[in-house]
């Protein structure tokens, strides 16, 4: 606002994606795509990984892709509040209310019903309800392949120094990165252990049972660590292909989707916000053509599958 962006706490420590011999070909394919698009990503073989990150156990690794520039992490809540403040300054009206129904007339949604009893007439409805997107779709008498999936993050401390640690993605699905004076870590569960879920209960055995052994294997200094806390949240998980659903729903003239980001939401939110705004104002995308992410792929069952998911 007033020419100044929000303070996001960007830490440019890089992303390091690791691959064993079985994943080397796929990593190289993805690396080629990134380089074709001008991304400055380094390919590090086993010796280069060991030289650059001497605290890393590379015995079972073949290669790594390291983005040292323009990659890292931010404070997502600061980004959210920055979006909100800017929207309010431009005239947006935020209501803290629970939606309980959508009034329909033919191929249009004509009003939104709130738990308070208020009814808001509307020209267009944008479903951006995150992990509850499916519930909103049901109110419109339709469906979305988006379900709430719980994810857990654990914070831990390590007395040993781990210099220049990036965000590390392990072939096992484990990830970890520095956070404050310590670290945070997590991993996605196996599909059979990943039910639809909206509670915030912690699995207090997750760290010692699953995460700690993998951490200690990849970073020997993590043999001596201590869990400090953690939290849970929910992915808006697109069960079709784990990618966003954007644009108009086929069943309605005025229902727009911005759903199913499956963990990519913070990264993609600036581009998606612009794209949906263009769609509402001009009737089509202008900056980026995101039609391939439309609802038609659900109707036609044509998933757009990401081949390297973390």
Question: Model-found features: residue ranges?
Answer:
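C-terminal catalytic lobe of FAD-dependent flavoproteins
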Residues: 213-310
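Short beta-strand to alpha-helix junction loop
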Residues: 17-26, 66-85, 200-207
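Glycine-rich "substrate-gating" loop/helix at the edge of Rossmann-like oxidoreductase active sites
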Residues: 67-73, 172, 262-266
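Helical element adjacent to the flavin cofactor pocket in flavoenzyme catalytic cores
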Residues: 66-124
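Central helical "cap/lid" subdomain
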Residues: 116-165, 287
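Active-site lid/adjacent beta-loop-alpha segment flanking the redox-cofactor pocket in flavoenzymes
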Residues: 143, 157-257
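Dinucleotide-binding Rossmann-like beta1-alpha1 core, especially the glycine-rich loop
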Residues: 1-52, 173-175
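A short coil-to-beta-strand element that immediately follows conserved catalytic motifs
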Residues: 10-12, 94-95, 145-151, 220-232, ...
């Amino acid at each position: 606002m007033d020419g100044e962006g929000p303070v996001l706490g960007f830490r440019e420590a890089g992303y390091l994606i690791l691959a064993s011999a079985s994943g080397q070909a796929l990593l190289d394919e993805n690396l080629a795509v990134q380089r074709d698009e001008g991304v400055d990503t380094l390919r590090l073989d086993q010796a280069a990984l060991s030289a650059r990150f001497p605290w890393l156990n590379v015995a079972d690794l073949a290669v790594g892709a390291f983005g040292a520039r323009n990659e890292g992490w931010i404070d997502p809540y600061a980004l959210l509040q920055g979006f909100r403040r800017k929207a309010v300054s431009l005239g947006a009206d935020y209501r803290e209310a629970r939606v309980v129904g959508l009034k329909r007339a033919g191929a249009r949604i004509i009003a939104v019903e709130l738990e308070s009893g208020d009814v808001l007439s509307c020209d267009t409805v944008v479903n951006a309800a995150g992990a509850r997107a499916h519930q909103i779709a049901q109110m419109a008498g339709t469906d979305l392949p988006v379900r709430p999936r719980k994810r857990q993050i654990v914070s831990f401390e390590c007395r040993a120094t781990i210099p220049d640690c990036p965000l590390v993605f392990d072939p096992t699905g484990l990830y970890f990165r520095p956070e404050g004076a310590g670290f945070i870590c997590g991993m996605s569960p196996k599909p059979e252990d990943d039910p639809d879920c909206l509670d915030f209960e912690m699995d207090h055995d997750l760290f010692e049972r699953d995460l700690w052994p993998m951490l200690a294997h990849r970073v020997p200094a993590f043999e001596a660590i201590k869990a400090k806390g953690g939290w849970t949240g929910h992915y808006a998980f697109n069960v079709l292909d784990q990618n966003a659903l954007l644009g108009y729903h086929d069943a309605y003239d005025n229902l727009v989707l911005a759903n199913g980001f499956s963990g990519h939401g913070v990264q993609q939110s600036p581009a998606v916000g612009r794209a949906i705004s263009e769609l509402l104002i001009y009737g089509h995308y202008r900056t980026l053509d995101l039609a391939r992410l439309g609802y038609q792929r659900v109707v036609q069952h044509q998933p757009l599958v990401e081949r390297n998911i973390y």
